[in-house]
Amino acid sequence: MAMQKIFAREILDSRGNPTVEVDLHTAKGRFRAAVPSGASTGIYEALELRDGDKSRYLGKGVLKAVEHINKTLGPALLEKKLSVVDQEKVDKFMIELDGTENKSKFGANAILGVSLAVCKAGAAEKGVPLYRHIADLAGNHDLVLPVPAFNVINGGSHAGNKLAMQEFMILPVGASSFREAMRIGAEVYHHLKGVIKAKYGKDATNVGDEGGFAPNILENNEALELLKTAIQAAGYPDKVVIGMDVAASEFHRNGKYDLDFKSPDDPARHITGQKLGELYKSFIKNYPVVSIEDPFDQDDWATWTSFLSGVDIQIVGDDLTVTNPKRIAQAVEKKACNCLLLKVNQIGSVTESIQACKLAQSNGWGVMVSHRSGETEDTFIADLVVGLCTGQIKTGAPCRSERLAKYNQLMRIEEALGDKAVFAGRKFRNPKAK
């Protein structure tokens, strides 16, 4: 089924920054997709095209990307008469038309907007749910509901507190279904709010970009202690484990790391990667930490490799791998991590996202699907995680509509699957293992 019309516009994301939305029309109707954007971005990500006109949205407008769709990509696709079910052909055509390594001609935000809309239209054309269409594109027979990783304490570049590490997450791995995981996560979240309020006052329960709390604490183990207390208070010590996203590239300074990077710089307090690794090992020993993302800088390969060889938890590459097959292959070769963080806008098309996921899975890695800190009400990644069977998703706290949009869609998908629904649970790192 051919595309009839493609129209892009500038809308606002959850942080009040412009982003790209695309409407694609076929005989089956209108299919809409919106593109997310990140705050802590890896230097190897595909290029998000911003206008740079400081007199408008402080330079963050996306009218150039919108124009690239409306004047170039859209007309070229309509002329080519490609079918919306041919995701790979459509994506390949756009990538070749762009012709750059990092999609800098049109912008990854332009190409991805169209790619997502095409995927939604393709599902409708086949008369199947989006998650089933994505599973077909990936060659998956199975469908798996993921364990949600709720980011309930925010630090790093996502919050105005002193905390260096960016996300402290709870994973209800002991739940029996996705719906139960939502309930457990929400209950722990509310208990955490009470614990923080009692200890630091009401102001400390203000929420960050992703719906988590941002109490003004400096010590990272204090955040872990708060989680441990809230998990106990909610009555789920046997069902909930902890994950972290350190985003260490944000506080990497001249080969070392600054755990107080939001204060005036003082090289005397910078620590080595090895020392930082020892701190993580103490977290793993004292708390139920099962997953650490970006523990070191995106180019500190040697420290990643030596750390992975000494722990048996999940080590996730985000800034390290940026959903890019070349970086993933490098990380596999160097044995730097054992899980990929999958963000569709880091690579910039549905096809390449699926390829990145399959490359990681074929090397025995886990895959965690992820939102960005600047989100929209688009729910594409909820269907994506089910179709790709990755078993884990992080899309914020159980708070703020742009986060709940994804979680609520996952509850609907589980409901639609009925007794065929499979929840990853404790097998979240490799849900397909029998």
UniProtKB/Swiss-Prot annotation:
It catalyses: (2R)-2-phosphoglycerate = phosphoenolpyruvate + H2O. Mg(2+) binds at residues 245, 293, 318. The active site is at residues 210, 343. Glycolytic enzyme that catalyzes the conversion of 2-phosphoglycerate to phosphoenolpyruvate. Appears to have a function in striated muscle development and regeneration. Mammalian enolase is composed of 3 isozyme subunits, alpha, beta and gamma, which can form homodimers or heterodimers which are cell-type and development-specific. Interacts with PNKD. InterPro entries: Enolase, Enolase-like_C_sf, Enolase-like_N, Enolase_C, Enolase_CS, Enolase_N. The modification N-acetylalanine is found at residue 2. The alpha/alpha homodimer is expressed in embryo and in most adult tissues. The alpha/beta heterodimer and the beta/beta homodimer are found in striated muscle, and the alpha/gamma heterodimer and the gamma/gamma homodimer in neurons. The modification Phosphotyrosine is found at residue 236. GO terms for molecular function: magnesium ion binding; phosphopyruvate hydratase activity. It comes from Oryctolagus cuniculus (Rabbit). Belongs to the enolase family. It comes from the Eukaryota. The gene is ENO3. Pfam families: Enolase_C, Enolase_N. One of its GO terms (cellular component) is phosphopyruvate hydratase complex. Keywords: Acetylation, Cytoplasm, Glycolysis, Lyase, Magnesium, Metal-binding, Phosphoprotein. PROSITE patterns: ENOLASE (PS00164). It is found in: Cytoplasm. It is an enzyme of class 4 (lyase). This is Beta-enolase. Its cofactor is Mg(2+). PANTHER family: BETA-ENOLASE, ENOLASE. The modification Phosphothreonine is found at residues 72, 205, 229. One of its GO terms (biological process) is glycolytic process. Pathway: Carbohydrate degradation; glycolysis; pyruvate from D-glyceraldehyde 3-phosphate: step 4/5.
